[in-house]
Amino acid sequence: VNMQYNQSAEGECQEENCDFTRSKSGKRIILILSALIDSRIAPLEFYALVFAMYLNIIFDRHSLEDVVGVGDVRKGKGWRNASPAKIIPFVKHLVRQMDQFPERMNTLYVLPVPSLAKGIWHFIRGFLKASVVDRVDIHWGSSSLHSSAPKTLLEFFDQSAMDDFERNRRSEFC
């Protein structure tokens, strides 16, 4: 999970201290690199709890701010790169944790999901509330190590944001 931000003491974003990436809609972005999840290091429930704790830290309790999530499922060099089927329990735990943060996730863009995973997505949808499913936007494509993010994302993010996603992903390579 990665979000770069710098706010003033009042929680306002000023031109001189805004160093976090935003979507075209102006929302802060949380980048989630699911291929880093390694159940040999910690249980999947732990990863979901850490994500919830991260949200608790970054959000002002008196704010109604919501964010855009970008779930990047591309493989990474030196990462666990678990199959989508192995991540299903993580998704279940994450949904339970996210119930503590209603309305905080505006949209979750998941990319690039291989076409073969369509069946897995339809399975996962069964565990999610309709209001959550409506906020998930899947972008299909190759998720190999050297795959580019789908160009369909340019509708929601400018090229500099897309470059930030890739730079952050590659910075985690071992």
Regions found by a protein language model. Name each.
Residues V1-C174:
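Basic, amphipathic alpha-helical/coil surface patches used to engage anionic, phosphate-bearing ligands
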